[in-house]
Regions:
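Sec-dependent bacterial lipoprotein signal peptides
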Residues: 1-24
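Mature, structured domains of secreted/extracytosolic soluble proteins
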Residues: 24-501
Length: 501
C-alpha cells in the first residue's frame, strides 16, 4: 500500500513538471517568435495599417517617403501618433520642403532596437540631423510601442513630436539679439576653387600655385570661420557654442580693440571682431548643470560662463548653445597669448656655418632642443643672426630667453632685436632691441653647482611694445668685435614674449 501511493505521487509530480516546462516553452515560443505575417509587410504597410498613425501616413505619402519605406533597404522609423501631430504648425504641413525635413527627422538608415542604446545612441536621421535614442525615449518623446520588426526594418511609435533641432549656425541665424556675431561670421564667406578632384598640370614657378586641367576644379562657397575655427554648421561633431548677444558683443569689442590695432581702421575693426568670436566653440557638450569653472575652446583659450549670464539654453542637433550677456576669461597669457619662439624653427638664418640642432637634458633632467652655431670669429655687417616670424597683438611684451653656453669656455653675448618687416636693419636704421646679454659658460662646472643650475634658468631681457597687431620678426644676433682669438657664438632654446598690461 505504501509503495503504491509513493509511486502514484511520484508519477503525478513527474507529469506536473512536464506540463510546467511545456507551458514555459509555449510562452517563450510565443514571446520570441516573430509575427510571420508582419515579416511580409514593409514599414510603410505596417504604418499605414495602424489607425493611430494615419496622420503620419499622410505625411509620408505627401513627402514621398512612402516609396522609401516600401524599398528593400533597412530603416528604423519612430512614428509620432495622431495625438502627437495634432498641434504641428500648419506652416510646416503646407510647406513640402519643411514637411520633408520634419518627416525625415523620424527615419534613420539601418535597424535600431531598444536594446542597442547603452544608455543612449546619437543617430543620424534622413534629414541629416542627429537625434538621441534611449531604451525608452526618442529625444524628448516617450516610446509607446517598440521593436515592431518588419520585412525592411523596425518601427517604434512615440507620443510627441517637434520640428528638427537646428545646428549651431542655423540657431545663431535666428537670434535677433545676436545679429552682430551672426553678421560678422557671415561676412567671412568667400568663393574659392575646390581642387580636391582637380588634375594638376604643373605649379606656377612664380606664384607656386597649382595649375589644373580645365573642368576638373569648380567654385565653391566657403567660410573662413568654419575653416579656421570650427564648422558650427556641421552635424558630424558635438559642441558647446557660445552666442554673445549684441550687448555682450559690443562690450567684448570695446575691451579687445586696444590689442588689435592697425594703421588701417577697417583692418583693426575686422581683427577686433575676429578676436571677439574666435574663442566661443568648445569640442564637448556641457549641460547647464555640468558647466565647469572653465572650458577650453578649440583655440586653446579658457573661458568661464556664469549661469546668471545665460539668457537662453538651446539643445542643438550638433550639441548645445548658450546665449549670454557676458563672458569671462583671463586676458593676458590666455585671450592675448604668450608667444613661444622655439629655436629650432627659424624663419631665416645668416650664419657662417650650418647650425646644429641638439636634444639634451637641462639641470633638472627635462629634455629640450636648442639651436647652436659655435666659434663665430667675425662680426660682419649685418651681424650673424637667427630670424623668427610670429604674430603678435598690439601690447607690451616682457622678453625672456633660455640660452645655454656649453660651446665656449669663455662667456659670449647675444641680443634680441625686433622688426615688423624681415630686414635686419643697420647701424643707420637700428632695430628695436632689448640689448646685449652675456651667457656664462657651464664648461667645467659641476652639475650639482648653483652656477650650473642657474645657467639653465629663463632670463628676463627687457620689454618690447608692439604698436599694431600683425607679423613680428624676432632676431637673435651675435655679438660685436668677434675674432679668431675672441670668438663668439649663437645658442638658444627659446625666446618668450609674455603679454603684460
Amino acid at each position: 500500500m505504501t509503495i503504491y501511493f509513493k509511486n502514484k505521487y511520484s508519477l503525478l509530480a513527474f507529469l506536473l513538471i512536464i506540463a510546467f516546462f511545456a507551458g514555459c516553452k509555449d510562452a517563450w515560443k510565443e514571446h520570441t517568435e516573430p509575427d510571420m505575417e508582419r515579416l511580409d509587410r514593409t514599414l510603410f504597410e505596417q504604418i499605414s495599417a495602424d489607425a493611430t498613425l494615419s496622420t503620419f501616413t499622410t505625411y509620408l505619402v505627401k513627402t514621398g517617403y512612402d516609396g522609401v519605406l516600401k524599398s528593400s533597404k533597412a530603416f528604423t522609423v519612430w512614428a509620432p501618433d495622431n495625438a502627437a501631430l495634432q498641434n504641428l504648425d500648419v506652416a510646416v504641413v503646407n510647406d513640402t520642403a519643411a514637411l520633408k525635413r520634419f518627416v525625415g527627422n523620424y527615419i534613420a538608415n539601418q535597424s535600431y532596437f531598444t536594446t542597442y542604446p547603452k544608455p543612449s545612441l546619437v543617430i543620424r536621421m534622413l534629414n541629416g540631423k542627429n537625434t538621441v535614442f534611449t531604451k525608452s525615449t526618442f529625444e524628448q518623446a516617450n516610446i509607446i510601442r517598440s521593436d515592431i520588426y518588419v520585412k525592411n526594418g523596425v518601427l517604434h511609435t512615440i507620443n510627441s513630436a517637434s520640428t528638427p533641432k537646428p545646428n549651431a549656425w542655423e540657431f545663431l541665424q535666428t537670434r535677433a539679439d545676436a545679429t552682430l556675431q551672426k553678421d560678422f561670421i557671415k561676412s567671412l564667406a568667400h568663393i574659392e576653387s575646390d581642387t580636391s578632384k582637380g588634375v594638376l598640370l604643373y605649379k606656377d614657378p612664380v606664384t607656386g600655385k597649382g595649375v589644373y586641367q580645365d573642368g576638373t576644379t569648380f567654385k565653391v562657397s566657403r567660410n573662413r570661420y568654419f575653416q579656421r575655427i570650427a564648422d558650427i554648421s556641421s552635424e558630424d561633431s558635438l559642441i558647446t557654442y557660445i552666442i554673445l548677444n549684441n550687448t555682450a558683443f559690443n562690450i567684448e569689442k570695446n575691451k579687445l580693440a586696444a590689442y588689435n590695432k592697425s594703421s588701417n581702421a577697417l583692418v583693426a575693426d575686422t581683427l577686433t571682431q575676429w578676436s571677439v568670436v574666435k574663442d566661443l566653440v568648445v569640442n564637448k557638450v556641457y549641460g547647464i548643470n555640468e558647466l565647469p569653472d572653465s572650458m577650453t575652446t578649440v583655440t586653446g583659450v579658457k573661458i568661464h560662463l556664469d549661469k546668471s549670464a545665460i539668457v537662453e539654453t538651446r539643445l542643438l542637433s550638433n550639441g548645445v548653445a548658450y546665449v549670454v550677456n557676458n563672458i569671462g576669461y583671463q586676458l593676458m597669457e590666455n585671450k592675448i597669448p604668450t608667444i613661444m619662439i622655439q629655436a629650432e624653427l627659424p624663419d631665416s638664418l645668416r650664419v657662417p656655418a650650418n647650425p646644429v640642432t641638439r636634444i639634451k637634458n637641462d639641470a633638472s633632467g627635462r629634455r629640450f632642443t636648442d639651436l647652436q652655431t659655435g666659434s663665430i670669429t667675425s662680426s660682419p655687417s649685418p651681424l650673424y643672426y637667427y630670424r623668427y616670424k610670429s604674430t603678435v597683438n598690439s601690447v607690451k611684451y616682457e622678453v625672456y630667453w633660455r640660452a645655454v653656453n656649453d660651446i665656449l669656455v669663455l662667456p659670449f653675448s647675444m641680443k634680441v632685436d625686433f622688426n615688423t618687416n624681415r630686414s635686419f636693419g643697420s647701424a643707420i636704421l637700428p632695430l628695436a632691441t632689448v640689448g646685449y646679454h652675456t651667457i656664462p659658460s657651464i664648461i667645467g662646472l659641476a652639475p650639482t653647482s648653483d652656477a650650473y643650475k642657474d645657467a639653465y634658468k629663463e632670463v628676463y631681457l627687457g620689454t618690447y611694445t608692439a604698436e599694431n597687431y600683425g607679423t613680428l620678426y624676432t632676431f637673435l644676433a651675435s655679438s660685436l668685435a668677434a675674432s679668431s682669438t675672441a670668438p663668439t657664438a649663437l645658442s638658444l632654446d627659446y625666446i618668450k614674449l609674455k603679454p603684460v598690461n
